[in-house]
Amino acid sequence: MRLVFAIAAALALSAPPVLAQALERGEVWSLKLGAPIADQPIDFVDHACGSAGGPPSIPLGGWADFKRCRPEESGLREVYFRYDDEREYVARAHHSPAEVERYGGTKTYGFPIVVSALISEDAIVRGLRIVSDPRYDANRDEAYVLKNFITARLGRDNWACEDLPMEEGETAVDGVYIKQRCARSLDGGTRATMWVRHLRKAGQARFDPRSGKQTKNQFESLVRLDLVQP
């Protein structure tokens, strides 16, 4: 797959030591589950109330404003954030295309994502949420492949996966139809739940029925991961 090969090629390129050191930054995996908000990374920006992968809502001044966000059914409050783009600017100044690609935008394993922390009433980060970001056209049709990288990180074994029923009007994308929910327990009782979708919804088609021209982005391809402590 194009994106997988591109990621592998990017990882094979190493930045000059000085640049690599300068570009170290936090990402979603840097969140410390079970730790208070005061101990979380400070190099994230644009905190806001999250919407499960949708656009951010109420702007926040930082982690400390989390109680302005409405609690979910679990009682946790979702706080959206994005990665600081300073590292991207440094990479551009050093004329390092591989590092620009690596540090451009909020990504994991090369996939654009929407990320958030799930915070309890006592200001402890109890979980994280990662959702594919559909706003980026490049390789959007391969967003579902992120599942493979997540299972490699968390462990490929002991996932209980359920194929969800096809709803009326849903169809495959170039012969591929995925609508799945997977879950597993990690050390310490942390629960990982992942939803994977790659399909066309009712009304979406590869070709416009009136003009016969190929449509653009008329499909859904995404991964959502919730990683939550008990």
What is each residue range found by the language model?
Residues A15-P17:
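N-terminal signal peptide c-region/cleavage motif recognized by signal peptidases
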Residues A6-A8:
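Leucine-enriched alpha-helical scaffold segments used for protein-protein interaction
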Residues M1-V4:
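Positively charged n-region of N-terminal signal peptides that target proteins for export
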Residues K67-D84:
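Long, compositionally biased
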Residues Q21-R68, E86-V114, E121-P230:
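Non-cytosolic coordination micro-motifs
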